[in-house]
């Protein structure tokens, strides 16, 4: 019988070829019947075919003869009724159906006989020994019985009874090894050990042997406990008894409770009597087994030669302390080879542990018959030392335990250690994950509420930003990851989802979430440290924040410029950013040390230097020498583009010129401004000057040349005839010129900080890409000529001030305008000379 027959039959029945074959067969049968009917009809008399049933042939003949009145002899026959004809046809069809059904049954029976029976069922393997109860283990062993050729006679049974009585009277009996006895005596010794329940056997039983076996169940069970004393007993004993495994079932089945109780008593006797057994070197059941077992099964032993040399004894290594020799005994093998069915075997009751010990001993002896059988007949010499060592080991264990635990197997302690190792790695379940999720949610929520309340306090904005970041990230974590994890826990508990979610999956997901939890907790810890330090944010943190803000401003200013050499610009910006950051750090430290110095707001304390492909923003420190007039509120610009557009339109379309002050008013104010600029220039820290010298190696020479430029400014301005021919508007709006002059410095600095688009169009030396259509005006052409002569001045602060001044100022004459412009230009050159660098634009490119 095999599954292939069933599969082929299944395919044969549903195959298209089989269906076609059946249809063709039916057609051939129907054609054959039709041919026969036609043949009968043509012959006009009914010849009965053997293949057609008798009833059908008779009806066909009658139908043919009645339907055709060709024969004169049959003309006087009465026609049959239609109802009768239909009834006969139905009977005929029924008969045909029954015959076909019976044929089908016979055919199926023949096919089944050829094919065999296909059995479907559940495979139930034998339960492991540590899960079997005592009764199941006892009942399962008779199935393993193998018939033995040894026949028990009445004399042998009597010898067995006498031997068991002697074993009951004395626990240990010394037997001297002597010459080998006759074959009958060997067989009788063999039968003495066959009766013991732990040694399975199924011998041919006579009536007297059965009665003897029933009379001594208690004595048999008492001898069981002495069997696993030494390794030699364990190795030699199973050898002759491998093929017989069914005997102990009958003995223990009769009185199992008594057998267990006897084993408890004998176990205590074993521990106390091993010293006497080893002192005589001939314990009961050890040398007798060694004498008799090899001689009984010599034929079987010859077929299984050991790979070890003769008289070789298997011993553990010298360094082993945990197992040593004890695993070779059945009791130690119980714990080593088969796990205990309880997690805490030392806390169980004595009766349960003893029952388990008996079952495990039986199973382990069955196992040992297969593994240690090879060398059982080769260990007669070193038996004494082995037994002595084992006796000492067992006695030491017995002293360490209490009186109530004497019945427990000695080597169940390793099983307890293994169980403890398993307990050390608990398997998390759904309740565990729900509890930890709830606890983490409550903890993080409390953190969020605590820091939300601190946002209402008067703390720096930087600290508030950090608090908002930590709280927001925590709430996002609880909203997203915690909700997702809660859904996975529900899927695991209620078995939902496309794929099954296991506790291992939950454990892995929670490990990932725990990293994010640690991150937000680290942020809260940093906030606590920040609060303890008085909300003083670290310099690195401030530096990073300022750098980010500054980069945003630069990007917004350059967005309208055509992009060329982006890689070079980015590299130059990065290098300059490092230098500027170091400079800011030094200045910030000096500001903290000099508390008496008045500090200008952040909007004013920067000088922006734009060289076309990079931009330098330097802080400015103003001391008490600065006049009060320069500290007035600055006139803020709306947007740089709007100012630029307004100025260019006012110059080109309306013809409004740049207004300057009168000579009387301009002189004192310019002198005062120059004094302010000199003070500012001299008050710059040495560290900043050294850094700027590193940026521009030729800076000292350029500063000296600024004085030459100051002397030639008037001549250059006079030569610009285009600027002198500008029309003037009379009757303009009269403003306070002195106020505008006082606000000049702050307006220049602030306008340059806001955006570089104005500077890009009005600097004296700029790259070609910054020249826009607004430079077509006559005023800016004049400024271009000035830039050709002032090659070393990179920043035109004069035109910056002109753009910031009101275009509607009243003026007396063009000479006053020219003189004021020259004075302002000279003043700003002396003011900004420390920021001169080279420009890639050549004078001939204008």
From Swiss-Prot:
GO terms for cellular component: cytoplasm; cytosol; mitotic spindle; nucleus; spindle pole centrosome. Residues 203-225, 269-281, 628-671 have a biased composition (Polar residues). Residues 156-174, 182-194, 250-266 have a biased composition (Basic and acidic residues). Residues 90-120 form a coiled coil. It comes from the Eukaryota. It is found in: Nucleus; Cytoplasm; Cytoplasm, Cytoskeleton, Spindle. Abundantly expressed in fetal liver. Expressed at lower levels in bone marrow, testis, colon, and placenta. Belongs to the SAPAP family. The modification Phosphoserine is found at residues 67, 202, 618, 627, 629, 634, 642, 662, 725, 757, 774, 777, 806, 812, 830, 839. InterPro entries: SAPAP (IPR005026). One of its GO terms (biological process) is signaling. Interacts with CDK1. Interacts with the C-terminal proline-rich region of FBXO7. Recruited by FBXO7 to a SCF (SKP1-CUL1-F-box) protein complex in a CDK1/Cyclin B-phosphorylation dependent manner. Interacts with CDH1. Keywords: Cell cycle, Coiled coil, Cytoplasm, Cytoskeleton, Isopeptide bond, Nucleus, Phosphoprotein, Ubl conjugation. There is a cross-link at residue 347 (Glycyl lysine isopeptide (Lys-Gly) (interchain with G-Cter in SUMO2)). Residues 153-284, 628-674 are annotated as: Disordered. Its main location: nucleus. Ubiquitinated, leading to its degradation. Decreased phosphorylation levels are associated with the differentiation of intestinal epithelial cells. The modification Phosphothreonine is found at residues 326, 329, 338, 401-402, 639, 759, 784. This is Disks large-associated protein 5. Potential cell cycle regulator that may play a role in carcinogenesis of cancer cells. Mitotic phosphoprotein regulated by the ubiquitin-proteasome pathway. Key regulator of adherens junction integrity and differentiation that may be involved in CDH1-mediated adhesion and signaling in epithelial cells. One of its GO terms (molecular function) is microtubule binding.
């Amino acid at each position: 019988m095999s599954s292939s027959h069933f599969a082929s039959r299944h395919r044969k029945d549903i195959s298209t070829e089989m269906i076609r074959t059946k249809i063709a067969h039916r057609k051939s049968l129907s054609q054959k019947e039709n041919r026969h009917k036609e043949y009968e009809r043509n012959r006009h008399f009914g010849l009965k075919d053997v293949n057609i049933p008798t009833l059908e042939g008779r009806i066909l003949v009658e139908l043919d003869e009645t339907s055709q009145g060709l024969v004169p002899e049959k003309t006087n026959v009465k026609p049959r009724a239609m109802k009768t004809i239909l009834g006969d046809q139905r009977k005929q069809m029924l008969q045909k159906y029954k015959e076909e059904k019976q044929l089908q049954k016979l055919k199926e029976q023949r096919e089944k006989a050829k094919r065999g029976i296909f059995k479907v069922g559940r495979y139930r393997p034998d339960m492991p020994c540590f899960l079997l109860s005592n009764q199941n283990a006892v009942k399962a062993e008779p199935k393993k019985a193998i018939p033995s050729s040894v026949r028990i006679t009445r004399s042998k049974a009597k010898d067995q009874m006498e031997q068991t009585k002697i074993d009951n009277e004395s626990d240990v009996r010394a037997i001297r090894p002597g010459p080998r006895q006759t074959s009958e005596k060997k067989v009788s010794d063999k039968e003495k050990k066959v009766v013991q329940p732990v040694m399975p056997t199924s011998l041919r039983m006579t009536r007297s042997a059965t009665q003897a076996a029933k009379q001594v169940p208690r004595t048999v069970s008492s001898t069981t406990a002495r069997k696993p004393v030494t390794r030699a007993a364990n190795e030699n004993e199973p050898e002759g008894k491998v093929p017989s495994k069914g005997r102990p079932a009958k003995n223990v089945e009769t009185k199992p409770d008594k057998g267990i109780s006897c084993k408890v008593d004998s176990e205590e006797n074993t521990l106390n009597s091993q010293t006497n057994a080893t002192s005589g070197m001939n314990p009961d059941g050890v040398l007798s087994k060694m004498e008799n077992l090899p001689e009984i099964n010599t034929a079987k032993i010859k077929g299984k030669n050991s790979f070890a040399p003769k008289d070789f004894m298997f011993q553990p290594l010298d360094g082993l302390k945990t197992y040593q020799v004890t695993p070779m005994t059945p009791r130690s093998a119980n714990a080593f080879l088969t796990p205990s069915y309880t997690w805490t075997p030392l806390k169980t009751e004595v009766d349960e542990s003893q029952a388990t010990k008996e079952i495990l001993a039986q199973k382990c002896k069955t196992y040992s018959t297969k593994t240690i059988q090879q060398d059982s007949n080769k260990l007669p010499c070193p038996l004494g030392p082995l037994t002595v060592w084992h006796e000492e080991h067992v006695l030491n264990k017995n002293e360490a335990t209490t009186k109530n635990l004497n019945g427990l197997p000695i080597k169940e302690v390793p099983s307890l250690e293994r169980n403890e190792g398993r307990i050390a790695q608990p398997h998390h379940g759904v309740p565990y994950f729900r509890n930890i999720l709830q606890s983490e949610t409550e903890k993080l929520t409390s953190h969020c509420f605590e820091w939300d309340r601190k946002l209402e306090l008067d703390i720096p904005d930087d600290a508030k930003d950090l608090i908002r970041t930590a709280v927001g990230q925590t709430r996002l974590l609880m909203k997203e990851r915690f909700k997702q994890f809660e859904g996975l826990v529900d899927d695991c508990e209620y078995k939902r989802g496309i794929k099954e979610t296991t506790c291992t999956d939950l454990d892995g997901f929670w490990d990932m979430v725990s990293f994010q939890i640690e991150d937000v907790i680290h942020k809260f810890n940093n906030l606590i440290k920040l609060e303890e330090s008085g909300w003083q944010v670290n310099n690195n943190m401030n530096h990073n924040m300022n750098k980010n803000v500054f980069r945003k401003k630069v990007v917004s200013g350059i967005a309208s410029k055509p992009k060329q050499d982006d890689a070079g610009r980015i590299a130059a910006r990065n290098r300059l950013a490092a230098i500027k950051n170091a400079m800011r750090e030094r200045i910030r430290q000096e500001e903290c040390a000099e508390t008496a110095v008045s500090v200008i707001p952040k909007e004013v304390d920067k000088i922006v230097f734009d060289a076309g492909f990079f931009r330098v923003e330097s802080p400015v420190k103003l001391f008490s020498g600065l006049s009060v007039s320069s500290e007035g509120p600055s006139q803020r610009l709306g947007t740089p583009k709007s100012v630029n557009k307004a100025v260019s339109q006012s110059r080109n379309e309306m013809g409004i010129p740049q207004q300057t002050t009168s000579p009387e008013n301009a002189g004192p104010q310019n002198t005062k401004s120059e004094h302010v600029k000199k003070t500012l220039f001299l008050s710059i820290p040495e560290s900043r000057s050294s850094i700027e010298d590193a940026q521009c190696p030729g800076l000292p020479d350029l500063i000296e040349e600024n004085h030459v430029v100051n002397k030639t400014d008037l001549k250059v301005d006079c030569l610009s005839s285009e600027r002198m021919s500008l029309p003037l508007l009379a009757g303009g709006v009269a403003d306070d010129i002195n106020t505008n002059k006082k606000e000049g410095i702050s307006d220049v600095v602030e306008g340059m900080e806001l955006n570089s688009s104005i500077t890009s169009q009005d600097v004296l030396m700029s790259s070609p890409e910054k020249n826009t259509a607004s430079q077509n005006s006559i005023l800016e052409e004049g400024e271009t000529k000035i830039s050709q002569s002032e090659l070393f001045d990179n920043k035109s602060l004069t035109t910056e001030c002109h753009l910031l001044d009101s275009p509607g100022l009243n003026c007396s004459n063009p000479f006053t305008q020219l003189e004021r412009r020259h004075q302002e230009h000279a003043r700003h050159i002396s003011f900004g000379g420390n920021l001169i660098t080279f420009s890639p634009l050549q004078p001939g490119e204008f």
